[in-house]
């Protein structure tokens, strides 16, 4: 993915369009590396991957254009030559003889003053069809997205070519070669189409959730063929497509095509890659199972909104009108996924309309309440209110033309004054914004209030802007300083909306204090907006911006769901086992007035089984949190289909605690199609070249029992390959802990009650840099008929990759343990389990030969 997901990219594009000085700064061409870098012993920093590719320095995201050419694998990648956050996007370059040992090469394709270089692919133009080389010296051709430095951020497809085997690149003078006038048209992957004898491009129409196919005979002139989608998961934009054939069960006569698409609406509600298996006829792709045709469990209908009325439900406000909607309302994209002729759609006259729709009380008679929901992603927040300030004493409201008396500023923030901005949540017309007209997000510095006496219990802060907590590289924070020590801190939410944060400071009553604003961030969302500071004896309540479906028990919210910023409704299910026999109500709430400030809902049904949402029905390459932008190697010499992904997550990619680099790739995987229970499924395994890193003598254990405890094993290491066969026994949960020590560990286990494999990184080490990082990531998996679980686990200094179910299920997660925590342990909770066999191999660093 070339840019972070919404709302970030739109904010960045708008900001860039409004601030020419920021554009000029970003457009400065980087200085390419002068020579190849083989890092060796330098790759010893904390968290540095030892057998996963990472650049020596700076930011990296999507892998681009991997290809085997003249005895070497070439890997290109999205790269910022000037820093450790997203920006200045160019193509970095590395080479390897074996997919394991990588040498970083000089910068391949740099940004320039007209465009950044976004993702794409590389082909070997053996016949010189492009005319960019000669018959004797045909070119390598990179097909990539040019992201224009224009107000609309137009994205077009361009070419660069190499006549020296990929060492140096020249941009084609006729760029762009494909322009449809869109700002969401990116990430081309090109392959040779044997059926038509021409080049085939798959490229994403990101905001439409479509992949478009084009054909060309010379890589310069492209003809539109067809589109695929929307289909499968559409909770985030579509990016980084790939299309390739695979033989089923190794039989070339039974070849299917696989289309992969990256999206930010995956199984962990974030970064992921989905795939479709189907057929490609040379012009269009047809999925065998697009995951769109679904019949939910039958049940008792509460309301389907199909008779032209709300059926006794009570509407208040302006968002619902007098009757259900027939589908799409004027001014929006088409609504899809609803059942029957009517649904609830609160886009009535636009997103500014607000209100509630409340059902009559009904009795819960079945375990599940299934329904469809769509629209804006604005969850219900407990304790929220109207956004007003409680009674109190104003420290600063930033409504004047200059800073309040006594405030001081340093660095690039010196000279900043409040600016007039129309921000949702603002209590006045002005705000203190560290995004400066001259430098944009690049401005850094501090702003400090005069001393004051703490004479109220709470300090309420109205803030917005970047989410860069204290202690991370490039923080954007507001802090309370008492006796020279920071005692409270808050940051933004990567949002242009202002909302309240509140500190309980009663313990400091009577003490002298200051408020300090720190902006050390220079990348996207590298700024803060502060709308006011207030001392009060009441906590300020965050503004209620929900677009949600809530279940009320005695008037209190006990379940809640929201949309995914999509006009496609999807099934959601609530388990109401604890509420059977109780009287409840459904509330549909639209309290948002900004973008995506509406909710869609339909088909409330009590049932004995849960309905499955699209994310549950879609097919995923990886169920972990850190796998994205997967792309396959062109011209792989062994006839394999090998993919490499970006091992990171857009939610926290610019906050992970690594330095002087930020970003790594997954270990290369080989893909295959196999038949399981009559279905064609995709299986994955690490490429066999991993064996080159194995130490000679593995540790082996057999028949190891464990009951209600953690059993340390006599083996340790930060870079390991583990093969395990575990038997469930009576345990509720069982598995292995890696990077174990000092009270920290990462658990890779199985939950017998839910039937799920999981990676638990809640106690894995450093996790506080983002609120979503400390989490348990789960995926459904059946044990074998004998109650056994086979695992293959790749452990590196800052990651785990878990292969299970004979490669049908993979979970990839980053972790950031203390370097001294290298233990391995067997564990079982709630009963007994057993390791029938364990093999642990130490892996040598790929950076030291």
Task: For each feature predicted by the language model, list its residue ranges.
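Surface loop/turn signatures of beta-propeller and other carbohydrate-active proteins
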Residues: 37-64, 83-86, 100-134, 166-192, ...
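Hydrophobic core segments of beta-strands in well-ordered, beta-rich domains
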Residues: 62-82, 104-108, 123-127, 131-152, ...
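Conserved Ser/Thr-centered positions that define the repeating blades of beta-propeller domains
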Residues: 96, 160-163, 213-219, 671
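Extracellular glycan-recognition surfaces and repeat-rich motifs
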Residues: 309-343, 399-433
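Short beta-strands within extracellular/lumenal beta-sheet-rich domains
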Residues: 341-368, 376-380, 432-456, 499-502, ...
């Amino acid at each position: 993915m070339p840019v972070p997901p919404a709302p970030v990219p739109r904010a960045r594009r708008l900001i860039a369009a409004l601030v020419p000085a920021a554009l000029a700064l970003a457009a400065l061409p980087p200085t390419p590396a002068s020579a190849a870098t083989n890092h060796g012993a330098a790759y010893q920093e904390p968290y540095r991957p030892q057998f996963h590719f990472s650049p020596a320095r700076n930011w990296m995201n999507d892998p681009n254009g991997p290809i085997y050419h003249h005895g070497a694998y070439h890997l290109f990648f999205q790269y910022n030559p000037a820093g450790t956050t997203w920006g200045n996007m160019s193509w970095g370059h590395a080479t390897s003889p074996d997919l394991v040992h990588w040498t970083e090469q000089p910068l391949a394709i740099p940004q320039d003053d007209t465009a950044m270089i976004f993702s794409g692919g590389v082909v070997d133009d053996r016949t010189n069809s492009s005319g960019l080389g000669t018959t004797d010296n045909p070119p390598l051709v990179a097909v990539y997205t040019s992201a224009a430095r224009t107000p609309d951020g137009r994205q077009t497809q361009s070419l660069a070519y190499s006549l020296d085997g990929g060492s140096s690149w020249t941009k084609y003078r006729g760029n762009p070669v494909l322009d449809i006038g869109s700002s969401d048209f990116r990430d081309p992957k090109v392959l040779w189409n044997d059926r038509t004898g021409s080049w085939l491009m798959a490229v994403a129409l990101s905001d439409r959730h479509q992949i478009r196919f084009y054909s060309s005979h010379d890589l310069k002139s492209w003809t539109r063929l067809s589109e695929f989608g929307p289909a499968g998961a559409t909770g985030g934009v579509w990016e980084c497509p790939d299309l390739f054939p695979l033989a089923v069960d190794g039989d070339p006569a039974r070849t299917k095509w696989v289309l992969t698409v990256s999206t930010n609406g995956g199984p962990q509600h974030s970064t992921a890659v989905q795939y479709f298996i189907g057929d490609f006829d040379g012009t269009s792709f047809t999925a065998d199972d697009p995951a769109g045709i679904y019949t939910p469990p039958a049940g008792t209908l509460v309301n389907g909104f199909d008779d032209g009325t709300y059926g006794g439900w009570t509407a208040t406000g302006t968002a619902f009108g007098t009757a259900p909607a027939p589908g799409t309302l004027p001014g929006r994209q088409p609504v899809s996924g609803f059942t029957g002729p009517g649904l609830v759609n609160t886009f009535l006259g636009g997103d500014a309309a607000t209100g509630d729709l409340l059902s009559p009380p009904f009795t819960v008679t079945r375990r599940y309440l299934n329904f469809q929901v769509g629209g804006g992603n604005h969850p219900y927040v407990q304790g929220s209110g109207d956004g007003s300030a409680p009674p109190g004493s104003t420290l600063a409201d930033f409504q004047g033309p200059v800073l309040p008396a006594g405030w001081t500023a340093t660095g690039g923030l010196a000279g900043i004054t409040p600016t007039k901005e129309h921000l949702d949540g603002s209590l006045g017309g002005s705000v203190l914004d560290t995004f400066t007209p001259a430098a944009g997000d690049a401005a850094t510095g501090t702003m400090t209030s005069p001393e004051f006496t703490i004479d109220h219990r709470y300090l309420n802060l109205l803030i917005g802007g970047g989410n860069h907590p204290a202690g991370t590289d490039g923080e954007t924070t507001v802090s309370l300083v008492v006796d020279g020590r920071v005692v409270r801190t808050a940051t933004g939410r990567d949002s242009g909306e202002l909302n309240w944060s509140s500190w309980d400071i009663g313990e400091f009553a009577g003490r002298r204090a200051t408020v300090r604003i720190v902006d050390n961030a220079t990348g996207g969302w590298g700024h803060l907006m502060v709308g006011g500071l207030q001392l009060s004896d009441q906590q300020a309540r965050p503004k209620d911006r929900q677009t949600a479906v809530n279940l009320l028990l005695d008037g209190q919210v006990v379940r809640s769901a929201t949309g995914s910023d999509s006009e496609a409704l999807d099934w959601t299910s609530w388990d109401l086992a604890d509420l059977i026999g109780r009287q409840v109500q459904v509330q549909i709430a639209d309290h948002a007035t900004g973008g995506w400030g509406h909710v869609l809902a339909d088909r409330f049904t009590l049932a004995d089984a849960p309905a499955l949402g699209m994310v549950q029905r879609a097919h995923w390459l990886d169920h972990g949190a850190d796998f994205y932008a997967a792309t396959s190697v062109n011209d792989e010499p062994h006839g394999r289909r090998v993919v490499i992904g970006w091992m990171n997550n857009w939610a926290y990619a610019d906050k992970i605690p690594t330095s002087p680099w930020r970003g790594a790739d997954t270990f290369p995987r080989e893909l295959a199609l196999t038949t399981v229970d009559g279905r064609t499924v995709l299986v994955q395994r690490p490429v066999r070249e991993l064996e080159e890193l194995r130490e000679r003598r593995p540790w082996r254990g057999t028949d190891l029992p464990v009951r209600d405890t953690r059993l340390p094993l006599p083996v340790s290491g930060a870079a390991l390959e583990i093969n395990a066969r575990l038997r469930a026994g009576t345990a509720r949960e069982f598995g292995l802990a890696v990077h174990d020590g000092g009270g920290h560990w990462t658990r890779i286990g199985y939950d017998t009650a839910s039937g799920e494999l999981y990676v638990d990184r809640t106690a894995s080490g450093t996790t506080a840099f983002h609120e979503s990082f400390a989490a348990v990531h789960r995926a459904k998996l059946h044990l074998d008929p004998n109650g056994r679980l086979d695992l293959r686990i790749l452990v590196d200094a800052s990651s785990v990759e878990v292969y299970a179910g004979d490669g049908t299920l993979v979970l990839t997660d980053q972790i950031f343990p203390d370097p001294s925590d290298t233990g391995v342990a067997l564990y079982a909770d709630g009963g007994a389990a057993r390791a029938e066999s364990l093999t642990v191999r130490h892996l040598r660093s790929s950076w030291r030969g």
